[in-house]
Amino acid sequence: MGWAQLHAAGAGPIVYGHHHVNATDLAAHKRFWANTLGGVPTAFGQSEMYKFPNVHVFVREREPTGGTKGSAVNHIGFRVPSVRAVLGKVRAAGFPVVTRQELPSGMAVIDDMAYIDNQDTYIAFVMAPDNVKVELVEDRDQEEAIALHHIHFDTNDVDAMKAWYVDTFGAIPGTRGSFQAADLPGVNLTYSGNPAALEGTEGRSLDHIGFEVENLEAFCRQLESAGVEFDVPYRELDQLGIAIAFFTDPFGTYIELTEGLDKY
């Protein structure tokens, strides 16, 4: 399997697949996802796609209603061998580094990086175009230049949201540092409590998240029997060789299910 394919595909019946971004400026997003972070640009249907290990980032030209902050998905995370090195690229490209603004005032931030003791790693936050918040997590033993690490949800009910993803997708419950979390092949799903009223993701800069599913048609029937109402029912896109379905989780996250995206 190639560098930028879904490495976790085949590691389980459900793996993480993609992020889908609404963009006001496609060129700016290309500078961020490809030129700065190193995603491999690929044409795909009506969207541009940037391939990273374990995630494809789709970008389409559509005015977003807001950034990731304030929605059910606060940010997305990538792991890198050196946070400092990636921050240098981000600054050189002119994108904002927002580590200090995004962490509690009592947490030490030096050179735009913070050491997280209970995870024994350094992190930083940067802002992609259209206010897509991105966390960088250091993994010094990582051989790849960059790979998907986590999706960080905000929710009014951490326990309920975590349980829903465990029950629905078979994610393995656990923790990540001080956060409640659950794991699927290729991704950590992280949950933070937020008492504020949170917007759904559909229409915002991170419009939806995506999972790659084996036997998708049967899985959709299973979800329907459990009470899930689909915004877009299961259908096959013969021209792309994939199948898709869309629904919204009980907490406002718009979700696409795919089968066949792992071939790209």
Model-derived features with residue positions:
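Vicinal oxygen chelate
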Residues: M1-A11, I14-T24, M49, G66-F153, T175-R176, A181, ...
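Short, flexible, solvent-exposed loop/turn segments with mixed acidic/basic and small polar residues
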Residues: A9-G10, E63-T68, R140-Q142, A196-G200
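Core segments of cupin and vicinal oxygen chelate
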Residues: A11, G17-F58, R62, A85, ...
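Active-site/binding-pocket entry motifs
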Residues: H56-F58, A196-A197, E229, K263
